[in-house]
């Protein structure tokens, strides 16, 4: 009990001393604030003298009161001084050791006093929860924790009061893997080492990265956007003008290439002409080149004029004989043509002129009369229009060629010129239909064979699309018949059709030339009947090979027959690959459609905005498929 009462008495005395110290601190701060600044040293000395004559307990209490009083006064004084410095001008400061503050009559900061007061208060309350033996130990060692706490808060206060005025420090950079260490700074901070800084040397790397993340000023990255060329500053009009200039230069180069082949030549190299025409023919050269590729105009330039006069005269004579009273008119054929002509290209003004309709009607009727095996079939009226429109540009100035579809030929052509135009169109149409006669004879077996070949080709190229058509019960004949009958003319605009025919006639010319070369090689010089005739039906030699079928040997009779079939199916064969490429182009969309949607889509495909570039891509894809499957007979089975 004695120990407990003694502890209680000590606690009450300390508590009373704390209370009295707070009151004394407030009173002294009031007296000091009212006193003059000149008496401050004497007051400090008097308090120091008095503290030495008092007992130890009272001395410690008085010392605490003095520190509290000095702290409050100096805190207010420093606050006013900092305000004046801020308002007047900025003055960089150096790091100052907090231990020297007592020498300059500066006491610790209020935060330190509050911390010490809290520690003292906590120190006197701790014996309630400890034994009597620990009370003595805590009392004897009460000054040591205060010193450690003072050092801790002094370091923090020192950091807060530091002002860095070294502007030559290198800027840290971010390197791969973390922050890079600055290279040997030219100046260092004038900060004195303390015990806390020495203890934190081991954690320097971690603290440097942590502190630098909040104070680093990263250098700006180079502005790559500003280094762009002047192309980005070009307007849309300038870009379009440059594109037009490039296209014009390309056209001029192509025209010069065709001039080198066609001009000032006695014999035109049809092989070179075919190769260069595959990629498109300039408009000013197209009428002559088409006549050469189709086989209507001879390659010997000296014979061309006489040949044209003879063929045009033959056409005039045929018209006179056909429409004379001596010849009875085929009323059903004439009536069918008369119905189909107004429905030919109704969206083009050229074919709505009466003069054009009369010319097309005469051409088609004369062809039907001269080819009774097939007669007139719907679809031939579409095939005649590319020739008619292309040959019509011969009678227009080069600057008006693009207006051919809106001008009435009767306004700039005489009757004789119109007849010559009809004659050239008639003979070229005849040359074209000779290659696809099977498409228009009874039963149209050529078209049925093409549709079958198309289905088998799509089965090899795109099996998923073929299976989808099978699941939806879509038959190729339901949409591909018109593709074969009109050569895709109703699926494209006339301008793109004419471009497509540049390639078609180039492909056709290759087989026709080969056939002609074969027949010319077989021609023997004329002999009299007295000379023995060389047997015609003999087994060919080992080195003999048909130009159109170089991979197999055959008799001359079979060679002629097969070459004729090859010549007639040449255009059909390439056209099948074009149709396959055209169908596969819409494969992704068709896979999502049912039967009705598929038929509707394929009967009216979205090709209204197609350009010559789109047609060239289609023809290139068709050529690739032909190169892969032309000699593979499995896909035709």
Swiss-Prot record:
Principal location listed in the UniProt entry: Golgi
Entry keyword annotation includes Cell inner membrane: no
Subcellular location: Golgi apparatus, Golgi stack
Region (Disordered) residue spans: 1-152, 187-233, 543-564
Residues annotated as site: Arginine finger: 343
GO MF: GTPase activator activity
A GO CC annotation given for this chain: Golgi apparatus
Biased composition (Basic and acidic residues): 1-17
Effect of residue 343 to A/K: Completely abolishes catalytic activity
A Pfam family: RabGAP-TBC
Gene3D superfamilies: putative rabgap domain of human tbc1 domain family member 14 like domains (1.10.8.270), Ypt/Rab-GAP domain of gyp1p, domain 1 (1.10.10.750), Ypt/Rab-GAP domain of gyp1p, domain 3 (1.10.472.80)
Chain segments annotated as coiled-coil in the UniProt record: none
Keywords from the UniProt entry: Golgi apparatus, GTPase activation, Phosphoprotein
Comp. bias intervals (Basic residues): 115-127
Record SUPFAM superfamilies: Ypt/Rab-GAP domain of gyp1p
Modified residues (Phosphoserine): 69, 250
Ranges of Polar residues composition bias in the record: 18-27, 46-59, 79-91, 98-107, 208-223
Sites marked Glutamin finger: 378
Bias (Low complexity) ranges: 28-45, 128-142, 187-207
PANTHER family, A to Z: LD44506P, TBC1 DOMAIN FAMILY MEMBER GTPASE-ACTIVATING PROTEIN
Additional detail: Present with 206 molecules/cell in log phase SD medium.
Function: GTPase-activating protein (GAP) that stimulates specifically the intrinsic GTPase activity of Ypt/Rab-type GTPases YPT1 and YPT7. Functions on the Golgi as a negative regulator of YPT1. Functions on the vacuole as a negative regulator of YPT7. It is also active on SEC4 and YPT51. Provides a catalytic arginine (arginine finger) and glutamine (glutamine finger) in trans to accelerate the GTP hydrolysis rate of the substrate GTPase.
Protein name: GTPase-activating protein GYP1
